[in-house]
Amino acid sequence: MRVYPTFFKLAFSWMDAERAHTLGFKGIRLAHATGAGRVLRKLTAPAPSLQTTAFGITFPSPFGLAAGFDKEGHGIEALTELGFGHVEVGTITGQAQPGNEQPRLFRLIEDRAVINRMGFNNDGAAAVAPRLKSARAALQRTYPAVRPVIGVNIGKTKVVELADAVDDYRISARTLAPAADYLVVNVSSPNTPGLRLLQDVETLRPLLTAVGEEADRAAGRHVPLLVKIAPDLSDEDIDDVARLALDLKLDGIIATNTTIARTGLASPAEKVEQCGAGGLSGAPLKKRSLEVLRRLKQATGDALTLIAVGGVETAQDVQDRLDAGATLVQGYTAFLYEGPFWAARINRQLARSRRS
C-alpha cells in the first residue's frame, strides 16, 4: 500500500500549491541534513544496469528531475538521494529576480497537471554558482564511481530587452558553466514576455553560438550544450530547430517545456480559467511531447542526445520515450503527486523490465 497519495490528499491538496512545494522541498532537504540521506541512498540507488551514457557522461539512471523543482541549487544532494540520475537546476538568470506575483502555481488534480507562471524566480547566477560547485564536489566524494549528474538551465532576465538577450545569457553561461555537467538554454518558457521569440532560428543561432563559446571558455573544457523547446512549435519550426542544432553541433535538445494549450482537460473549464495564464505541465502534455520527440528523432537520427520531458508519470512512460529515441528522460509534475520515492520506484521497474 502506498502512503503518499493519502498524505497528499490530507496534507497538501487543500494548501496553496507553492507553499506545499516549499514545505515538501524543505522536508527533502531536512532528511539529507539529519543523516537520513545515507539510508535513502541505499534504498533508492539505481541498479547498475540502468547506467546510461550521454554526451560523454555516464548517468546512474536515464531518469532525472527536470528544471523547475530546485531553481537555485539548494537541494541537489538531497534530491539525488531519492534516486534521480540527474538533477537539472534552474531556470537561473543573469540577475536575481523575484518572478511573477503570487499566486502563480496551480494544481489541476483531476488532470494530474499543474499550471505555473512562476517567471524564473531565482537569486541569480552569481549566488547559485557556489552551491553548484559545492554540490558537485560533494557528489564526487559520495559517489566516486558514477555520480548523479548536475544540469544547469539558464534563461533571460525579465528586465533585459530581447535585443540584449545574448549578453544576458552569456553572463549566466560564464558564471555557471564551470560547475555544470551540462548547460541548457531555455527559450521556451511562456512566462517571460517575448522569450519564445528567441526560438526563431535566426535569433537562436547567434544566441546558442555565443553561449557555447562562453561556457567552454569559462569552464576550460567543453560543456555539453542543449536547447529546450516548447511543445507549441509547429512541426516545421521543430524541423528548423533540429537542423540548426545539427548545424551548430549542439549536444542535444530537450523536448518539451510546458504548453500554453488548454485542450482536452478533465478539470472544469471555470477552474482552468481561474488559474489564468501560464504553462501547463503534467499528464495532458504526454501525447504532444512524445510527438515532438519522435519528430526530432526522425530529423536528427543519432547525431544528438534527446532528453524527453512532459507528461512522464510511470516507468512505462520512461520506456516509451527511450523506445522513441530519447537517451534520457525527465519528470517533475508527477513528483508532486507521487511523492519522494517516485524516482526510486521508476528505477526499480525499469531494472526489472531489463532483467525479464
Swiss-Prot record:
The keyword Oxidoreductase applies. InterPro entries: Aldolase_TIM, DHO_dehydrogenase, Dihydroorotate_DH_2, Dihydroorotate_DH_cat, Dihydroorotate_DH_CS. It catalyses: (S)-dihydroorotate + a quinone = orotate + a quinol. One of its GO terms (molecular function) is dihydroorotate dehydrogenase (quinone) activity. SUPFAM superfamilies: FMN-linked oxidoreductases (SSF51395). The active site is at S189 (nucleophile). Pathway: Pyrimidine metabolism; UMP biosynthesis via de novo pathway; orotate from (S)-dihydroorotate (quinone route): step 1/1. Monomer. This is Dihydroorotate dehydrogenase (quinone). The gene is pyrD.
